């Protein structure tokens, strides 16, 4: 399903989704705009509430500093196991292709709910 992630988070009951993806959310690359990024500890907590034990959170970006922020945010929720950086099968998105064309490295993070 493709939809506005924030709208779905607010409306869905716990355990609704087995797999949640946020692929290439807006990186807000200017330092003064970093606080506008979607992936933060509150977002991770809300997403983990939506998945059952064994469910996964998949994040992807082509901005290294955003990847660092995503890694740190995933670590804030103890219900998640360590994030893997092995890319799971998925289509190449338009934003991903833009990043590749610009020479940026793609980072995929996949964390599984363990408790």
Outline where the language-model segments fall.
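Short "lid" loop at the C-terminus of a central beta-strand within the Rossmann-like core
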Residues: 7, 27, 64-66
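Class I S-adenosyl-L-methionine
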Residues: 69-115
